Amino acid sequence: MKFSSKINHRHCNQLFIGLLFASMLVFGSNIQAEPADFSLPDMEDKQQKLSDYRGKWVVVNYWATWCPTCLTEIPELVDFHEDHKDKDAVVLGVNFEDIGLEGLKRFSEEYFMNYPVLRTKPAASSALGIIPGLPTTYLVSPEGEIVARQVGPVTSKLIAEFINQQSTE
């Protein structure tokens, strides 16, 4: 019997998609109803608490400078924050890597990040739940409950539509 050394890309894609959906089923069930109230330093070393934003929707986005998908997502988060910060929602970007403070400041200026950027060390989970990959975004309701988690990129439109749907239910 001879095994082919050629990779069938269609089968690999099907396997990847199957594993992706399976991981979403496993990880998706770990959303907590009431999050722990985290407190993380921002780029000015001021502690930011999640509970300080009660009364607004909070988009908590875990990201890193080395993550290409995170970088393409940043303009979407900038747009969403700009459109909603004075109304009903804010974005908190949580940098999830070991990076110097000055490097992080330069990076956030270069990408015009208009929302608070908080700092934490990489770990398998956070106060909000598991971080299976980057970017990971949690959506916290005005009451402080985690209502959604997205592993992978989000768009301004997707976030706004989800909030509108939740607000009308």
Regions found by a protein language model. Give the residues of each.
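Short loop/turn microsegments at loop-to-beta-strand junctions
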Residues: 35-36, 58, 134-135
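Hydrophobic beta-strand anchors of alpha/beta hydrolase catalytic cores
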Residues: 59-60, 91, 137
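Bacterial N-terminal signal peptides
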Residues: 16-26
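N-terminal secretory signal peptides that target proteins for export/translocation
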Residues: 1-11
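N-terminal "domain-start" segment that seeds a small globular fold
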Residues: 26-50
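Short active-site neighborhood of thiol/selenol oxidoreductases, capturing the structured segment around
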Residues: 50-68
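Thiol/disulfide oxidoreductase modules built on the thioredoxin-like
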Residues: 106-113, 119-164
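Structural microenvironment flanking redox-active thiols in thiol-disulfide oxidoreductases
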Residues: 71-111, 121-125
